[in-house]
Amino acid sequence: MTSVNKQLLKDVMRVDLERQQHQFLRRTYGPQHRLTTQQALTVMRVAAREQTRYSQRTTQCVAAHLLEQRAAVQQELQRARQLQSGNVDDALDSLTELKDTVDDVRATLVDSVSATCDLDLEVDDAV
């Protein structure tokens, strides 16, 4: 357990003890007594302090988590940009070259078959 968590636990226990003390004073002296009213103010002050510390700790944890996630998101964004800028253009160029090569091989094959077999094969550009 970290020191911050120990402090939070102590604060919660302190609030509980102050509430028990307030209930005791209320039963003993009544709700309108000066000590009961003073203890009620003490309970509110201690509870507010505990809630403030808890909120601070929660904010610190969330901020730390966001900083960790920010670094990971930035790395992923950098990878995506690299893939987008480099590999897409290279892949598109490779696919265009492959298509041109396939079209050339197809045209050569059709011409060879037409010449060898004395057939009049038409190259269909729509395919």
Curated annotation (Swiss-Prot):
Record localization: Virion
Ranges in a coiled coil: 60-109
Keywords noted in UniProt: Coiled coil, Virion
One matching Pfam family: DUF2664
Stored InterPro entries: Herpesvirus_UL96
GO cellular component terms given for this protein: viral tegument
Sequence similarity: Belongs to the herpesviridae UL96 family.
Name under which the protein is recorded: Protein UL96
